[in-house]
UniProtKB/Swiss-Prot annotation:
The lineage of its organism: Bacteria, Pseudomonadati, Thermomicrobiota, Thermomicrobia, Thermomicrobiales. Mg(2+) 2 binds at residues 191, 227, 231. Disulfide bonds: none annotated. SUPFAM superfamilies: 6-phosphogluconate dehydrogenase C-terminal domain-like, NAD(P)-binding Rossmann-fold domains. It comes from Thermomicrobium roseum (strain ATCC 27502 / DSM 5159 / P-2). This is Ketol-acid reductoisomerase (NADP(+)). The keyword Transit peptide does not apply.
Length: 335
């Protein structure tokens, strides 16, 4: 049974007199900085001189420093830039400014778990991982609700790392919803598996395969799009609201019966075995090594695969059909 912490389990007094240096001002960074500040915590933002986020952070009222200046100022240093750049930022800007008693904070365990970043033993290392995009974390904080989060401690040099991490989570508003205790290992491996097998890799390729199957059988691409992609949101919303049981309760009996008899034919033993292999690649660090090598080589395969999928026929069909839906906000992807 999971250990879950709430407002009464966390004390913002553990952040009193401390400065949080938020390094990065993207999806998570802006929300962490604003929520902590609005909870009464002293916050500075660390961004490189050429960062496009500097003006945004300044307009939000923050003192913006270089990453190294912010790391020097911070008692708690939050590493909220993308995984693949964290090691470089740590070595160049953070490691030289670490002192006994400081706490290094993460929102994802990748670089600690896979040994990309190895902090000295006299600093605390913790993680608070809100389970939502940053804009939702911020919006729900403003509404006084909060989103669930995970909390973990990797090093407890001070003897207070857990209390400080829970205070940080409370400053984000997460203890209003509940904060689940975990480890860096568990968070990293389950997060990567979820992305690869279900949320991103699994769903996107299932959609494309369903679309291709219908179109190859002679059905109109527009109709195929609605059946395998557009209606997915309706189903996911039902699952999100009440679990698989609520989705099955809400759909037609025909759809529910098809779920039971045909679902196991799609997600069969071969697929489950493949999932186990994906998990093994994550657990052994094989995937991490592959992703690190891809970045060090300049991402040639990553960019090639991105372009290939952008050219999939489902994208052109989707662009045309979404133009028929004026209630949707137009989303432009930077080139």
């Amino acid at each position: 049974m999971a250990t879950i912490y709430y407002d009464s389990d966390a004390d913002l007094a553990y952040l009193a007199g401390k400065t949080v240096a938020v390094l990065g001002y993207g999806s998570q960074g802006h929300a962490h900085a604003q929520n902590l500040r609005d909870s009464g915590v002293q916050v500075v933002v660390g961004l490189h001189e050429g960062s496009r986020s500097r003006e945004r952070a300044k307009s939000d009222g923050f003192e913006v420093l270089t990453p190294r200046e912010a790391a020097a100022r911070g008692d708690i240093i939050s590493m909220l830039m993308p995984d693949h750049v964290q090691k470089g930022v740590y070595e160049e800007s953070v490691a030289p400014e670490l002192r006994p008693g400081k706490l290094l904070m993460f929102a994802h365990g990748f670089n600690i778990h896979y040994g990309r970043i190895v902090p000295p033993p006299d600093v605390d290392v913790a993680m608070v991982a809100p389970k939502s995009p940053g804009h939702i974390l911020r919006d729900l904080y403003v509404q006084g609700i909060g989103v669930p989060a995970l909390v973990a401690v990797h090093q407890d040099a001070s003897g207070q790392a857990k209390q400080i991490a829970l205070a940080y989570a409370k400053g984000l508003g997460c203890t209003k919803a509940g904060v689940i205790e975990t480890t860096f290992k568990e968070e990293t491996e389950t997060d990567l598996f979820g992305e690869q097998a279900v949320l991103c890799g699994g769903v996107s390729h299932l959609i494309q395969a369903g679309f291709e199957t219908l179109v190859e059988a002679g059905y109109q691409p527009e109709v195929a799009y609605f059946e395998v992609l557009n209606e997915l949101k309706l189903i996911v919303d039902l699952i999100y609201e009440g679990g698989l049981k609520f989705m099955r309760y809400s759909v037609s009996d025909t759809a529910e019966y098809g779920d039971y008899v045909s679902g196991p034919k799609v997600i069969d033993d071969h697929v489950r075995e493949t999932m186990h292999k994906l998990l093994q690649d994550i657990q052994t660090g094989r995937f991490a090594q592959q992703w690190i090598a891809e970045n060090e080589a300049g991402r040639p395969n990553f960019y090639r695969m991105r372009q290939e999928h952008l050219q999939h026929p489902i994208e052109e069909v989707g662009d045309r059909l979404r133009a028929m839906m004026p209630w949707l906000k137009r989303r432009e992807i930077p080139s």
